[in-house]
Amino acid sequence: EKQSFLSLDMPNRLLFYPKTVPNPKNTKENEVLFVMKILTSTQFKELDKYTIEHEPVSSTDLMERAAKAIAAELKSRWTTATRFIVFAGPGNNGGDALAVSRLLCNAGYTVQTYLFNITGRLSDDCLNNKKRLENLAGLLFTEVSSQFSFPEVDEKDVIVDGLFGTGLNKPLDGGYAGLVKRINASPAKVVSIDIPSGLMSEDNTYNNSSAIVRADLTLTIQLPKLAFFFGENQKYLGEVNPMDIGLSAEGLAA
């Protein structure tokens, strides 16, 4: 039975790179230490902008680059016998998910995609990728504006979580919280794009643990997020695999 989606209960930081440093005590001679710099969500936006302006590359093409890296990783782990169920949100995380859907479908996978457009407002890049999906043969695509029924899934399926990324600034509630609960209760493997939906990228103060996706695999864009280093968040992340999409090294060093 369908229900209304909205009423469903349900300092300086930067990149990971190898750098030889003078050996402190208790390290082996010639040992290479790793210096990890971690970006805030604002700094990530600035790095994206810097890459777009200085490479130069369009934001749509940069999103396509991320989607290709993610799709390649998924194809390396699962055969075309696997069904992917993709949940895309209205922002750029959702745009990534829609682009991944298209690439998987074109590679011969069965893909069932849901775009949650509750407010009627999509980011520009999400809208562009929606348009590229609409006439794609073989893709099961549903745009959700109010009514939603969670699909039947089994342990052989893979759910791709592309609902919300690092731009999230408040806990998920209503239909989105209910959707996350259904994802977490499902027998399918769960892969999150960039960060598990519902998890704040920098601060645990406002996390609602019952409304955060518990991923088996997190394919994070370019760099680990600050929240990944908090012990209490490990249960949401699963395996973390950074996807190098060629963001500007010059911008990272700035």
Name each model feature, range by range.
Residues T20-V35:
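Short, Lys/Arg-enriched N-terminal segments with co-localized hydrophobic residues
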Residues L6-L8, Y17:
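Short hydrophobic targeting helices and cationic amphipathic motifs
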Residues M36-L39, K156-A254:
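YjeF_N-associated NAD(P)HX repair module
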Residues F34-T80, A249-A254:
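Positively charged, low-complexity intrinsically disordered leader regions
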Residues L39-T42, V57-A69, N92-G95, D124, ...:
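Conserved active-site and cofactor/substrate-binding residues in soluble primary-metabolism enzymes
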Residues A71-L163, P171-I193:
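Nucleotide and nucleotide-moiety/phosphate-recognizing core
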